[in-house]
Regions:
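Noncatalytic scaffold domains of N-terminal-nucleophile
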Residues: 4-37, 41, 49-210, 215-217, ...
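Extended active-site and interfacial segments that coordinate phosphate-rich ligands
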Residues: 280-281
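Metal- or metallocofactor-binding catalytic centers and their adjacent structured scaffolds
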Residues: 291
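Conserved small/polar residues in nucleotide/adenosyl-binding loops
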Residues: 295-297
Length: 297
């Protein structure tokens, strides 16, 4: 009877609200399964964490166009176990020299859409800088999976289809996006269809062979500048060629005996995080128990 009761019990009394996933050797977490698999394979063949991050970054440029594209920017924190040193690289996109703050004050739409708001992309420079200084495998080896994925195609997810439908109004304003992501009936890429990007494959291949210069100088840089200037933007070839990813001093604090390191300015999130932790340290969170207020902290 007790065995039957255990099987039919509908409420399981977990001992913790957290359910961590544990890996014995390494772990890769991304927003797309193709990118996760690529990062896993890089680590499996002996690459380090930076190798995997770079490979994943370029893979996301293929499979997560709304957020992982080569036209974006970001920040990266790198911890070296041997030296216990944390390095931080700022590769945030930069405003073109000709852009002025007053251009974006009066019109809310101008702040969000169109070529005027495009900044000089930093992702390629940042990922390549991280690889050059901290990677172990060759760049062609890291980018080969993304080159093949863009050339041979991948299965369109429900997520990608939904995002293209959700953003259709603004996406259709751009002819390149219109031709790339929508059919003649202006319907977005169909779920489970195979999406191929031969031009992106060639772009990543050029980066793999010639590094940063392939993207920020020459044919690709000229295309980006021409596209921007002919559509009301300000990005020039000079803006592209002068872009550099930079090392920044990371921010450090302590929290209940732990050393917390995060990205410093120009990123703002890290500063807010550390300030929040410093405030929370003054409260006994364990004593408050499980309640709505604690969950929403």
């Amino acid at each position: 009877m007790s065995s039957l009761s255990a099987r039919t019990q509908t409420t399981l009394d977990y001992q913790s609200i957290s359910h961590p996933v544990i890996g014995e050797n390494f772990m890769v977490s991304t927003q797309n399964r193709y990118a996760t698999e690529i990062g896993y394979e890089i680590l499996k063949k002996g690459g380090n964490a930076v190798d995997a991050a770079v490979a994943v970054g370029f893979a996301l440029a293929v499979v997560l166009p709304r957020a992982g594209n080569l036209g974006g920017g970001g920040f990266i924190l790198i911890y070296e176990k041997e030296t216990q040193k944390v390095s931080s690289i700022d590769y945030r996109s930069a405003a073109p020299v000709a852009a002025k703050s007053e251009m974006f004050i009066s019109d809310n739409k101008v702040q969000r859409f169109g070529h005027l708001v495009n900044a000089v992309p930093g992702s390629v420079a940042g990922l390549l800088k991280a690889h050059k200084d901290h990677g172990s495998l060759s760049l062609p080896e890291l980018l080969k999976p993304s080159i093949e994925l863009a050339r041979e195609g991948f299965e369109v997810s429900y997520d990608l289809n939904y995002v293209l439908e959700w953003g259709k109004e603004s996406m259709l304003m751009n002819e390149t996006s219109k031709k790339k992501f929508y059919d003649q009936s202006l319907e977005p890429l169909k779920v489970k269809s195979i999406f191929k990007q031969p031009l992106l494959s060639k772009t990543i291949e050029k980066i793999a062979m010639n590094g940063k210069e392939a993207f920020y100088e020459g044919e690709i840089a000229k295309w980006i500048a021409d596209e921007s200037l002919s559509n009301g933007g300000f990005i020039t070839i000079q803006d592209m060629s002068s872009y550099e990813a930079k090392y920044r001093k990371p921010l450090v604090t302590s929290y209940r005996g732990y050393k917390i390191v995060t990205m410093g300015p120009a990123a703002s999130g890290g500063l807010v995080l550390l300030q929040t932790l410093n405030i929370m340290e003054n409260f006994d969170l364990k004593e408050s128990g499980h309640n709505l207020s604690l969950i929403h902290i």
